């Protein structure tokens, strides 16, 4: 099927949902050669991925991952990467605040790809055991409303793609698929993207993948996060409908900063930044976490405004609930 699909793509023809899903199945099963995988990814990128092609590919990738079993609504806070901004780990830090606010967070991540420090890197530097089996992570999720799923543990089939992606050295559909293939089947999601043109299409993809409440965001300073230094373009998913709007820090009483104020560093440096924020240290980095946490809380709850959600996020940090959440997570991940 992958050869036929390449022929279609070279002729600028869109693939059907069924064909795109079958191709992903071939790739994830190890049935496609590196040459064919590279040709397919390049041809798809040159044509431009459709909503159906992305959705089908994500569904195909999910079929081949190890699942984390649970019985609750869970939130994923994630970015596609590729913004080349080298910010500190905003999404990961935000996860501790949001989960401490009572919203279960199932974070899915990897080591660094497009930055100096990925989610797995900073958590490891904080002392978290990232190598837990799915059953152990499920227990922690049940116990404290938070877990981390290391991509290499859950997506072993990616070994068939990794060498090709490294050699190609260009963005491919897999830059988008990682955040869409949460092993816990997250039905709540804040997804940051690396270009504005992806906001609406990926909101439609999340809707097709069964996300109940979600938000796709792009900071106009280039960040794949809700930005504290510029406007953020948003598309919100609620009750099967999409809503477009713009977010600005001033809406919740925060002051814009320079993009450089959010830059991080090595895993050890970013771990220190995360711990300082959760301990109550003030400044732009804390405000960026409050902004992103407020958006998550507001997105999930029906009974509050964005401003009230920001107050909740601030109180969670100032009351030390967020730092206690981090310390408890470290403790539970290392228990034997």
Curated annotation (Swiss-Prot):
Sites where the protein binds 5-phospho-alpha-D-ribose 1-diphosphate: 79, 82-83, 87, 89-92, 107-115, 119
Residues reported in the UniProt entry to bind anthranilate 2: 165
Cited Gene3D superfamilies: Nucleoside phosphorylase/phosphoribosyltransferase catalytic domain, Transferase, Pyrimidine Nucleoside Phosphorylase, Chain C
Pathway entry: Amino-acid biosynthesis; L-tryptophan biosynthesis; L-tryptophan from chorismate: step 2/5
Membrane-spanning ranges: none
Catalytic activity annotation: N-(5-phospho-beta-D-ribosyl)anthranilate + diphosphate = 5-phospho-alpha-D-ribose 1-diphosphate + anthranilate
Cofactor: Mg(2+)
Binding site for anthranilate 1: 79, 110
Top-level class of the enzyme under EC nomenclature: transferase
Keyword set includes Oxidoreductase: no
Cofactor mode of binding and number, as noted: Binds 2 magnesium ions per monomer.
Assembly: Homodimer.
PANTHER family given in the database record: ANTHRANILATE PHOSPHORIBOSYLTRANSFERASE (PTHR43285:SF2)
Family that this chain belongs to: Belongs to the anthranilate phosphoribosyltransferase family.
Function: Catalyzes the transfer of the phosphoribosyl group of 5-phosphorylribose-1-pyrophosphate (PRPP) to anthranilate to yield N-(5'-phosphoribosyl)-anthranilate (PRA).
This protein's name: Anthranilate phosphoribosyltransferase
Species of the source: Lachnoclostridium phytofermentans (strain ATCC 700394 / DSM 18823 / ISDg) (Clostridium phytofermentans)
């Amino acid at each position: 099927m992958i050869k036929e699909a390449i022929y279609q793509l070279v002729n600028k023809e869109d693939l059907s949902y069924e064909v795109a899903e079958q191709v992903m199945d071939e790739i994830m099963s190890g049935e496609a050669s590196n040459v064919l995988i590279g040709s397919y990814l390049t041809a798809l990128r040159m044509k431009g991925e459709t909503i159906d092609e992305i959705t089908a590919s994500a569904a195909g990738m999910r079929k081949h991952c190890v699942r984390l079993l649970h019985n609750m609504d869970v939130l994923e806070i994630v970015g596609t990467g590729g913004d080349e901004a080298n910010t500190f780990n905003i999404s990961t830090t935000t996860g501790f605040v949001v989960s401490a606010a009572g919203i279960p967070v199932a974070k899915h991540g990897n080591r660094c790809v497009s930055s100096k420090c990925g989610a797995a890197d900073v958590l490891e530097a904080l002392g978290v055991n990232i190598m837990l089996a799915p059953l152990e992570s499920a227990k922690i999720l049940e116990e404290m409303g938070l877990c981390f799923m290391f991509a290499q543990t859950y997506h072993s089939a990616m070994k068939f793609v990794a060498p090709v992606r490294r050699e190609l050295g260009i963005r491919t559909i897999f830059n988008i698929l990682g955040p869409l293939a949460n092993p816990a089947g997250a039905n709540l999601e804040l997804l940051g993207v690396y270009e504005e043109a992806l906001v609406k299409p990926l909101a439609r993809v999340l809707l097709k993948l069964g996300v109940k409440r979600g938000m796709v965001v792009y900071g106009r300073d280039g960040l794949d996060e809700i930005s504290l230094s510029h406007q953020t373009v948003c598309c919100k998913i609620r009750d099967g409908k999409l809503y477009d709007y713009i977010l600005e820090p001033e809406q919740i009483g925060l002051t814009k900063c320079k993009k450089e104020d959010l830059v991080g560093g090595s895993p050890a440096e970013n771990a220190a930044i995360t711990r300082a924020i959760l301990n109550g240290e003030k400044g732009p980095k804390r405000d960026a976490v409050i902004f992103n946490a407020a958006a998550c809380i507001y997105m999930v709850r029906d009974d509050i405004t964005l401003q009230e959600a920001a107050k909740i996020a601030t109180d969670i940090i100032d009351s030390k609930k967020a730092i206690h959440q981090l310390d408890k997570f470290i403790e539970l991940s290392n228990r034997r």
